Amino acid sequence: VVRPAPPGPDPAALEQLTDWVTDAARPVIICGGYGQRAGDADTLARLAEKHALPVIAYRPRHSPIPSDHPWHIGFEVGAHVKSADLIIVVDSDAPWLPQLHTPNPDARVVHIGADPLLSDYVMRNFPSHLGITGQSSLVLAGLDAALSERGPSPYVAKRRKTVDAAQANLREIGTKEVQTASKKSLSTTPWIAHCLNAAKGPEDLVVTEMVFPMHLLDFPEPGCHFGLSPAGGLGWGLGESIGLKLANPDRRVIAVVGDGSYMFGNPTPAHFVCEALALPILTIIVNN
């Protein structure tokens, strides 16, 4: 079987994006489903570090960039989209929640993906000043090459200062959350995340099917975290975990699910399948 070449970006659109990135003082990249393919995280990590581009993994389905990357600014978009002058959306159907977040009305918004406007969605109301169709990793690699030819942006130092402040704030929030959680008689999600992070190994695969404090988990390697896809629906986590264990029998799989998600995942047949096929998974059920 001869596989077709993946779609690449339109040169004119890529040049337009290159201009906007060079001129942006407060750009931000928001990823949702990016990181599925091998090499995706390396491509984005290289782009972000070489060209001073902050990255947010908002409600991520995969790890788009290592969690310890110097340009990773966390998992929430609120304050960042409010101040950004350029928002680059990569493989994300909902880069922010309009009822909770108010982007800068003067910001340019760019959507990147195989179908950047998600044309099969009945309704989707997010602004778009530029849509670039193509396999996202190829678009980002093309942007990297185009920016390298231009030379550094005059705003690199300003971007670095913004990122340093964002990362320091995220660390402070995480420390306070864990300290507060440690004093409570019942476990809360920050405490569960803190304990899970201390117990898991670098090769463990973690599935989350609930709103979870991702900033308290370390994922320095790509392909170690899997979050709920909009195509899944409630109950996806158990089946996903079984599939991951089947594909990776030598790696530990940890599923973190809410009690409702657990029940919708048909736990009785799920655990019977695990037993019958010798596919042990660790399931953490959160009463949320």
Where are these regions (language model features)?
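General beta-strand structural signal in soluble alpha/beta enzymes
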Residues: 30-31, 55-58, 89-90, 132-134, ...
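Active-site diphosphate/adenylate-binding microenvironment
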Residues: 164-250
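Redox- and metal-dependent alpha/beta enzyme cores, enriched for Fe-S-associated oxidoreductases
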Residues: 38-58, 201-204
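Glycine-rich phosphate/diphosphate-binding loops that line cofactor/substrate pockets in enzymes
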Residues: 13-27, 47, 195-202, 245-251
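Glycine-rich, acidic loop regions that bind phosphate or pyrophosphate groups
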Residues: 57-163
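Conformationally flexible catalytic loops at phosphate/diphosphate-handling active centers
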Residues: 1-21, 172-176
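Glycine-rich phosphate/diphosphate-binding loops and the adjacent beta-loop-alpha structural elements
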Residues: 25-38
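Thiamine diphosphate
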Residues: 83-95, 213-288
